[in-house]
């Protein structure tokens, strides 16, 4: 049961309305998470700006794989449903690739290095080793790319924490519990 309300269209603060309307138009419906997040125009619009900027980072398969890995570590079932859906339908990842990403890996070596690094960042709270940095650099990522990976980890963690705190009603397909994959 949700611990906050998902706003109805007439309840959305005026400063959140353009952002929420754009998401609704783009997605085709208003996810409960966004309808709740819109209660705070400052937080909602800041997150939306970060999301817009980070949608240009790396490639969609890598971004979605990182989202899956981070959401798995953070135990966010809402976000795992969202990222599993987008990974399948937008990034065109196979079911096996989605499970692998949730475990912090990928089939393609360069993407695997990014996902493993993101997994290390979230597990160690950023206290990665020199060897971790060397591995991701050796895979072909620049320091700018590594900063983007870190920003993606932070962005996905924000929505993980938001959804874990407020426990929104799921409006994306449920995923298999992590213990059984």
Feature locations, PLM:
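Hydrophobic alpha-helical segments
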Residues: 1-181
